[in-house]
Amino acid sequence: MRLIPLVTAEQVGKWAARHIVNRINAFKPTADRPFVLGLPTGGTPLTAYKALVEMHKAGQVSFKHVVTFNMDEYVGLPKEHPESYHSFMHRNFFDHVDIPAENINLLNGNAPDIDAECRRYEEKIRSYGKIHLFMGGVGNDGHIAFNEPASSLASRTRIKTLTHETRVANSRFFDGDVDLVPKYALTVGVGTLLDAEEVMILVLGHQKALALQAAVEGNVNHMWTITCLQLHPKAVIVCDEPSTMELKVKTLKYFNELEAENIKGL
């Protein structure tokens, strides 16, 4: 596992965007051989999306031959709702780059048959072979996507009940009213995530410090979903300074020395 210890949220977003752009450009995607990118929503990736849009406008990257799969979507929220993840992605990213509409894949939280929708999503991912890079965030309790504590580390795309803590955290997007936050969501599974060629998780803020400590210094544990990264051959965590407050000094020193060349120029 790689840990990229930075200082600010803006630096985390810039590093993540630069990493994605480098991966896409090195892949040299074509219409017949697209780069497959997994994407998250929420507050954490906003700086990364902003940086990606800026790099696209500067001519440094094209998304014309990129196929995307989003991590999750609320159940029962109309896709036109401003807080649906469909709306979020278009507002913050898709509407500002050159990705074709047919290359965008989002779960349908209003599908008449939820199980069939989850199977369809898994099959669509498999039809491309694999996701080349999956970017994600992490919750205070260590959840990735909506794989809440005690999620199976072999799980696939499915419906999940959201914990009260997650709904309270997400209520900031619903005028602070937890009752407006959906109780269920569709989410890719931990196994789906681990199937990706590379997984990059962004961690911001002191409230994520225990989750980061579990991921880097703890044992693999289904109560801390983020620890699944220890099982992945190519996992990278990009974090800001406040999120590292629970890490041992020697752990942080080790990764700072290891990644010194990779964190220059931010």
Swiss-Prot record:
Pathway named in the protein's UniProt entry: Amino-sugar metabolism; N-acetylneuraminate degradation; D-fructose 6-phosphate from N-acetylneuraminate: step 5/5
Domain of life: Bacteria
Presence of the UniProt keyword Protease in the record: no
Function: Catalyzes the reversible isomerization-deamination of glucosamine 6-phosphate (GlcN6P) to form fructose 6-phosphate (Fru6P) and ammonium ion.
InterPro entries xrefs: Glc/Gal-6P_isomerase, Glucosamine6P_isomerase, Glucosamine6P_isomerase_CS, NagB/RpiA_transferase-like
Active-site annotation: D72, D141, H143, E148
Keywords assigned by UniProt, alphabetized: Allosteric enzyme, Carbohydrate metabolism, Hydrolase
Broad EC category: hydrolase
Source species: Klebsiella pneumoniae subsp. pneumoniae (strain ATCC 700721 / MGH 78578)
Site note Part of the allosteric site, residues: S151, R158, K160, T161, Y254
Originating gene: nagB
The keyword Hydrolase appears for this protein: yes
SUPFAM superfamilies: NagB/RpiA/CoA transferase-like
Assembly with partners or alone: Homohexamer.
GO cellular component: cytoplasm
Entry's EC annotation: 3.5.99.6
Family: Belongs to the glucosamine/galactosamine-6-phosphate isomerase family. NagB subfamily.
Record's catalysed reaction(s): alpha-D-glucosamine 6-phosphate + H2O = beta-D-fructose 6-phosphate + NH4(+)
Gene3D superfamilies, sorted: 3.40.50.1360
Gene Ontology BP, a term: glucosamine catabolic process
CDD domains assigned: GlcN6P_deaminase (cd01399)
Protein name listed in UniProt: Glucosamine-6-phosphate deaminase
